[in-house]
């Protein structure tokens, strides 16, 4: 990488650290925050936790391709700054809400600007040589993972000591800081000498995706993966309450969230390097099967620390899925359309984020927590099977020639 690109990676690592840390500071106790608005039944809280999670991603699902295209045309740096400011403002105002509807509407507003981390991936991806894309994207992800690791525990401590409202205010300050950091980056686009087209119409981008069946499959299973991953998020703190009790609940829920982040942090960069060497699709299939197998025991634990251990082992596998997926898109999509392709990828991920929390809330409300883990496990294994079948059916398209991959741009 060029010196300016390395500097950008360094800055965006810290920006992602602050954004991810800030977002996960409040995620573990959204359901607990809703409980403070009135005397509600457990089923009511579980259902509204799911809807409040999901509404952010409804807006993000609609706006992600738009932001991606704007980024391709006018620069991703501007989009990153707007995203940070929009998220920071909405989270700041969440500290003043008095009803679940007010929280719901602010989460909707936040969704319009959500996408800082995916946009930062596009920002760095376009200035990264293809042969090291997995390692670089894995390195970038360690920033958000480290933030995610520290965020829940810090959020739990702040919530227990100062209350939920003050935690939202501190969270917004961190996100505003991330937007400020972006000002010190320099936008660079590493053009391939074979890429003569400098811009593509939306129709051309969609046709490119359709004509590359493995790329299309990777984008589509992004939704399934997120359905699986986010189905547990809204009810994890309630599950911790069942296993551990209500004492210092926000703190212990934060630890459960962070355990997955620790495993993720340890392996994200390593999975990227492995995929650079052996092929992104093959490693992605392996990771999906492993994640499915590791998720299953979570529904049958009998104490809190068993859940923490399982969350850690799950994080080891989940850590590679996003950087490997982004690196594959970097390889298959021309630079001039990468923002929009990644926008569709992000949009489908957010679509999964819409379905996942609602599904998790409904399943846990009617069938119990264990059923959520079983469903999640099956969805991840199904995603791996779909990608495996697609790879076998389109071998020539899916094949990743190491010599081709290692050619410098």
Labelled PLM ranges:
Residues 78-93, 172, 282-297:
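Structural signature of the two symmetry-related core transmembrane helices
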Residues 167-183, 373-389:
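Symmetry-related core transmembrane helices of the 12-TM Major Facilitator Superfamily/SLC fold
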Residues 61-98, 275-278:
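Conserved MFS/SLC helix-loop-helix module at the cytosolic interface between two early adjacent transmembrane helices
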Residues 29-46, 235-251:
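Short amphipathic helix-loop junctions that connect adjacent transmembrane helices
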Residues 90, 101-109, 294, 305-313:
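Paired small-residue
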Residues 51-67, 258-269:
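Central cavity-lining transmembrane alpha-helices of secondary-active solute carriers
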Residues 106-144, 327-328:
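Cytoplasmic helix-loop-helix junction between adjacent transmembrane helices
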Residues 1-6, 188-219, 403-409:
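Juxtamembrane intracellular "pre-TM" segments in multi-pass secondary transporters
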